[in-house]
């Protein structure tokens, strides 16, 4: 596990207002959380001349009033920041991601490896697009590397209806 202070040490997902995820999405979410906790890069920039308490940080993700909420606390639980992102920029990418995931899960059951690989490449491309969008939307609020953004995008998909 990365021991840098610029990381997430805990991730909570508030999906209490949502229907239960499919087994595949639930598995994606578990893997994303595990991978995030194993290795991530998450930095909060100072704002308006104020220093930010050093990490590691605990992240609570939720959707409230059609906005994605990042609630950030220190490892000990002291609130550090909260910011809200519009879901609009993510909606089409999330929809495309769910569609390609459905195709991928179906393909795994019945298609030859070459066709599965082609669908998986498309799935990864859409996933990367979502990660880049997330990095752009987090600009000035939090800095994350592409791998962290990819895993966070997976968690966003678990919170946003496709």
Swiss-Prot record:
Residue numbers spanned by region Disordered: 1-22
Domain of life according to the entry: Bacteria
Q: Which HAMAP family match?
A: UPF0262
Family from the record: Belongs to the UPF0262 family.
Write down what this protein is called. Answer: UPF0262 protein Pden_1958
